[in-house]
Amino acid sequence: MENLKKVTIYTDGACSGNPGPGGYGAILIYNGKEKEISGGEKNTTNNKMEMMAVIKALEVLKEKCDVEVYSDSAYVVNSINNKWVYSWKKNNWIKSDKTKAKNIELWEELIRLISFH
């Protein structure tokens, strides 16, 4: 079994107007040290910013780590924890209600990063 670094990540994203200007932030904690990251876009959605917070935080990690992510986004948390996103991908990004999933490029990147860790 690998002896991986344990990293805890807290994320958040927000948007004014939805769509509208928005931003994201994350705090990564490893061995008592903290690193903050943030960013934003002029025209985005709340869900995109929630996803970007997780993606950008995971991109900071340059090696495989034992990662625990905390997010207040039901969209992100439920899609990952309930494995919906994997079903959407398997079904050519069609959800159970027969509609096309949104933010496909971001979901693909998030899946790639999760599979690395």
Locate the predicted segments by residue.
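RNase H catalytic domain
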Residues: A14-P21, I55-H117
